[in-house]
Amino acid sequence: MSDSNLDGVLVLIPARMASTRLPGKPLADICGLPMIVQVAMRAQEAAIGRVVVAVDDIRVFDAVSAAGFEVVMTSSDHQSGSDRIFEALQKVDPAGKAEFIVNVQGDLPTIDPETVRAALRPLENEAVDIGTLTTEIDNEEDKTAPHIVKVVGSPVSDTRLRGLYFTRATAPYGKGPLYHHIGLYAYRRAALERFVSLGPSTLERREALEQLRALEAGMRIDAEIVDTVPLGVDTPADLEKARRILSARTG
């Protein structure tokens, strides 16, 4: 995305207090700061546009606000991060100035700012509705693991795939690379509006993968190929790993 478009980019970070494996994780301490603040810092370092955190708990609201970041309260009833960021979008940009919405998950405290920027690149092609990220799988166990979502895609360049399907199964069959989907999205505003209006689709329910809703509706998702998968913090062990990574960076 060129610099001329940066005024039209809004980065939204959904944060939810309820977590089965790591309750209250947005406020988990990482190097003296709540995890959600660390994520907001990485998003700000990407320097692609306005950053807003969408929360569902006053404690998270206060922590983000105290750190100097823009924050908006959203419903605790949302079933997905996409629904949460859409509510936030309506509240923080009712005039519709933002043309591109980047959804950065609130549990990625170690994400490289360049990785955030990369999600926007597929939208340079006006035929693309949603940009996302992927990386080649180099671990044999990951190729068959259902928690590793695979992108079945057709190459459109050396660094980009057109997403044809997303699955927890091992796919595609045969020789060649397999790609791990990274759940960071950049939407055209109209695409996000359409996406949330559709409701869950048949394949989305079957695979438990929200992005299939877009594909079933005929929307185009392209995935930029990046070098590494950012650490998602879902367990106490993940949290300790994130602390080690950021401690080493600030060293």
From Swiss-Prot:
<comment type="similarity">
    <text>Belongs to the KdsB family.</text>
</comment>
<dbReference type="GO" id="GO:0008690">
    <property type="term" value="F:3-deoxy-manno-octulosonate cytidylyltransferase activity"/>
</dbReference>
<comment type="function">
    <text>Activates KDO (a required 8-carbon sugar) for incorporation into bacterial lipopolysaccharide in Gram-negative bacteria.</text>
</comment>
<comment type="pathway">
    <text>Nucleotide-sugar biosynthesis; CMP-3-deoxy-D-manno-octulosonate biosynthesis; CMP-3-deoxy-D-manno-octulosonate from 3-deoxy-D-manno-octulosonate and CTP: step 1/1.</text>
</comment>
<dbReference type="GO" id="GO:0009103">
    <property type="term" value="P:lipopolysaccharide biosynthetic process"/>
</dbReference>
<keyword id="KW-0548">Nucleotidyltransferase</keyword>
<keyword id="KW-0963">Cytoplasm</keyword>
<keyword id="KW-0808">Transferase</keyword>
<dbReference type="InterPro" id="IPR003329">
    <property type="entry name" value="Cytidylyl_trans"/>
</dbReference>
<dbReference type="Pfam" id="PF02348">
    <property type="entry name" value="CTP_transf_3"/>
</dbReference>
<dbReference type="InterPro" id="IPR004528">
    <property type="entry name" value="KdsB"/>
</dbReference>
<dbReference type="InterPro" id="IPR029044">
    <property type="entry name" value="Nucleotide-diphossugar_trans"/>
</dbReference>
<dbReference type="GO" id="GO:0033468">
    <property type="term" value="P:CMP-keto-3-deoxy-D-manno-octulosonic acid biosynthetic process"/>
</dbReference>
<keyword id="KW-0448">Lipopolysaccharide biosynthesis</keyword>
<dbReference type="GO" id="GO:0005829">
    <property type="term" value="C:cytosol"/>
</dbReference>
<comment type="pathway">
    <text>Bacterial outer membrane biogenesis; lipopolysaccharide biosynthesis.</text>
</comment>
<protein>
    <recommendedName>
        <fullName>3-deoxy-manno-octulosonate cytidylyltransferase</fullName>
        <ecNumber>2.7.7.38</ecNumber>
    </recommendedName>
</protein>
